[in-house]
Amino acid sequence: MPKVKSGAIGRRRGRQEQRRELKSAGGLMFNTGIGQHILKNPLIINSIIDKAALRPTDVVLEVGPGTGNMTVKLLEKAKKVVACELDPRLVAELRKRVQGTPVASKLQVLVGDVLKTDLPFFDTCVANLPYQISSPFVFKLLLHRPFFRCAILMFQRELALRLVAKPGDKLYCRLSINTQLLARVDHLMKVGKNNFRPPPKVESSVVRIEPKNPPPPINFQEWDGLVRITFVRKNKTLSAAFKSSAVQQLLEKNYRIHCSVHNIIIPEDFSIADKIQQILTSTGFSDKRARSMDIDDFIRLLHGFNAEGIHFS
């Protein structure tokens, strides 16, 4: 009897699992290339909704509702749910699922890319995000006005850990400090890959984000310009990070614009490199590294540069 190759067995099992997935999803083929992994565990869905502490008067923004496993439970607790979904097939499934139910009138569906969509007013955001858009969506949320109360978001585990990382942590990065400048961030729970259909290749985590209201009195473009420079090589000293010719050209251009606007005469022997080093030394950050600096450190450094007419945007 001929042997059956293990590869053929694996492919057959894969097709069988795929057929089971299609059957359980009403015949839909999920597109994992755009992050379609449907959260199927009702215990985790209930836990996420509990963490949101919804009020009967709340408008909830749900991003990536999929086939509506979480949506139907949100509709039971909130005044209104605005669901943003990219895939028209899933939109049809979602509408079919709530059609004719007492909560159908509470659902509004936005069809399209949430990053390109003008967000409506909402009190709370609950989302099982496609991982490809996680980072830009966080900042779209945090720069949204009027302020929302909180967001309960599912992320790829590593990205979630970056959001909550502290100075000195291996994963501490530009995303960490920018998010924590604008919001309080808490890691709520881990979610294993088998809680999704189809399972993703990585583990997930749920994070709670609460925007700071009022926000810190800082120009975010200025702030991010500084943070971007220092975190390109977060293990370098700031003195080394600012020796980049591209960085010095940008800052000199901005400095000359500042001086022109304020009628400040620039000496003929002016050196932007010397000016930068003077500021780093006077603020005490010349030998510091971005990986170990907290929000207060960066605020002091930004104020030090701005006070000398050097800007980052």
UniProtKB/Swiss-Prot annotation:
Keywords: Methyltransferase, Nucleus, RNA-binding, rRNA processing, S-adenosyl-L-methionine, Transferase
Binding annotation for S-adenosyl-L-methionine: 37, 39, 64, 85, 113, 128
GO cellular component terms listed in the entry, alphabetical order: nucleolus; nucleoplasm; small-subunit processome
Disulfide bonds: none
Gene Ontology molecular-function annotations: 18S rRNA (adenine(1779)-N(6)/adenine(1780)-N(6))-dimethyltransferase activity; RNA binding
Subunit structure: Part of the small subunit (SSU) processome, composed of more than 70 proteins and the RNA chaperone small nucleolar RNA (snoRNA) U3.
Family: Belongs to the class I-like SAM-binding methyltransferase superfamily. rRNA adenine N(6)-methyltransferase family.
The protein's role, per its UniProt record: Specifically dimethylates two adjacent adenosines in the loop of a conserved hairpin near the 3'-end of 18S rRNA in the 40S particle. Involved in the pre-rRNA processing steps leading to small-subunit rRNA production independently of its RNA-modifying catalytic activity. Part of the small subunit (SSU) processome, first precursor of the small eukaryotic ribosomal subunit.
Name recorded for this polypeptide: Dimethyladenosine transferase
Chain's gene name: DIMT1
